[in-house]
Amino acid sequence: MTNNHRRPLSFLVLLALFGFGAALVGQAPPIDWQRVETESMEHFQAVLRFDTSDPPGNERQAAEYLKQVLEREGIATKVFELEPNRLNVVARLQGSGRKRPLLLMGHTDTVNVDPAKWTYPPFSATRNGGYVYGRGTVDDKDNVTAALMTMLLLKRSGVALDRDVIFLAEAGEEGTTRVGIQFMAQQHFAEIDAEYCLAEGGSVLRSEGRVQYASVQTAEKIPHGVLLTASGTAGHGSVPLETNSILKLAQAVATVATWKPPIQLNDTTRTYFTRLAAISPPAEAARYRAVIGNDAKAAQDAVDYFAKAKPSLASSVRSSISPNIIQGGYRVNVIPSEAKATLDVRLISGQDPEAFLNEVRRVVNDSSIRVEWIPRDVRPATPSARLDSEVFKVLESAFARHYDTAVLPTMSTGATDMAYLRAKGMQCYGVGPAVDAEDGPKGFGAHSDQERILETELHKFVRFHYEVVRDLARAQ
């Protein structure tokens, strides 16, 4: 009788121990975030040290480095190349297929540099005073590094995935998209096809060291170029003429630059101003509410105020024009017969381009001035990403957890490669690390001559990025 009792008890103890041990075997140890920070910095500095200025781009070395790191971890990786040295890297972690994939996208090229204007060499990835300095630190090798670390950490964790997670390090975002996202979207879309995409375009805004809010890019304006060509009468500079082409052009440029296209709001901008008003001092909040209110004059007054005090806000609610190039004349004593101006036009998505061009002609109101589009790398017009999606909800939760702040959807006045993916029906969201509002005016922001990022904010963003992707992709 005693033996009969011992056997079941021993069996249960062994079973319990076996089950507990099996659980330990199947469960990855907790992530050592200090080690992750060291590894993240190693990869970040490595990709920063590759000169991928575009033009010419030459992303090969950066792409090969990323490929090597991913493959060393046992992650399947492919390379796609339209032109020599313009490489796009695609890697994939397989999920169960219960949900459609999630794409993590970043670009390895950067804008050009004038080394003479940099305190630290722009491709040295110098660390000083808690910052990392270098071209690409906040556009966009921070996102590339975060996506890379997310892939590595997901692989090491062994977490079961309900969806594939795809990594895309693309070439050519800074002006040569034909070798990057256009090439991938048109010829290799099956390799990157996903339900959702996380890419650049957002940030956590800090002011005087304190977090103000998090921005998630859910829409963007569409870039176009307009050429004004004024024709006049040539002559001697000693006899001023009213038909001087430069005079005509100057008047046209001044007229069109001060024109105020109508205010146009979408889901993104309405929600942005609503949420911004909720966290702003009373006087500012009143202006933000006026923009989305029913009083047209109050809305226009608010936008006029923004045009002087916060130009980016004014640009976010209407199609915009900025005269950026003027050409005319070849010597001081000759009145030229022709002069030209190039206008940078950013259309609100949904604006009819031809209707807008006709409006420019109406505003110029001079038959001697030709108004036409100029060839440009025009991204497709696309609707805003949804604000009620699974991704946006997970982002809101993660920003609250990591930064204790509100999330504002934003419409970028600039352009990103997400436009090509949104045109394919993908829901795309732009995120990024915390940046100081003071950095831009001081010359420390993206595309500046002292581009930099706080080391602590890079590390915080890597952890944030990983947890967002984990929560979106892991098996439920």
For the regions a language model picked out, list residue spans one by one.
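N-terminal secretory signal peptides that target proteins for export/translocation
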Residues: M1-R7
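Short pre-catalytic strand/loop immediately N-terminal to key active-site residues, enriched for Gly-Thr
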Residues: N128-D139, V407-L408, S448-Q450
